[in-house]
Amino acid sequence: MAEISSSLEDYIEAVYSIYTKDNKVKAIDVARRLNVSRASVTEALQKLEQFGLINYGHYGTISVTEEGVKKAKEVIKKHETLSEFFENI
């Protein structure tokens, strides 16, 4: 599985989280969740698509690939572990 930047990790985690709750994701949803501009989201989504983690449709629909699900779960686990570590310091 390809290594992605910590910034892209935040994006795949957000996309996956929205997808599992609503079964549909739009760029504006990701922008609101991460409090970033739509332009930043578009750039990140294009990169995630290049890595094969999402499918980014012409009409703004986003779906998570199998690889994307694996990566998102890996990122969530990593973030939970870090959070637990810092809570116990």
Language-model segments: which ranges?
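Basic, amphipathic "hinge/linker" alpha-helix immediately C-terminal to the N-terminal HTH DNA-binding motif
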Residues: 60-78
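Amphipathic alpha-helical dimerization/coiled-coil segments
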Residues: 80-89
